[in-house]
Amino acid sequence: MAVMNIEYYSEVLDMEWGVTVLYPDASRVTEPDCTDIPVLYLLHGMSGNQNSWLKRTNVERLLRGTNLIVIMPNTSNGWYTDTQYGFDYFTALAEELPQVMKRFFPNMTSKREKTFIAGPVSYTHLTLPTTPYV
């Protein structure tokens, strides 16, 4: 499993945004032209960042040998919401991030039924409204 740290300019947030991605071993990608690898958006908790799951859990070991892309964005303490006087983390997470990640990883699924989201209960509930991918 490859671990990639990606920083890209987010137009929604108007700043550089950090994302850590776990990408399956090439041997786990069943077909070279596969465009349907499932994806998990793994959200961190308060005071965490895009690397919290790697540093504080066995997520990399648990996912080794699976055919799953895991995307862990950094939202600081943004609570995954759009705010009037802060950042629009919900829009960035639900709309912009899947599109950007699809450009980085063209074989990542676009299917809603193969797109998952997880994280601390107190935050994940904020991401449940209907969105294009998440």
What are the residue ranges of the model-derived segments?
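Short beta-strand element of the alpha/beta-hydrolase
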Residues: 35-45
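Short substrate-entry loop that stabilizes the transition state in hydrolases
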Residues: 46-67, 73, 78
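Alpha/beta-hydrolase active-site loop
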Residues: 85-106
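Conserved small/polar residues in nucleotide/adenosyl-binding loops
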Residues: 124-130
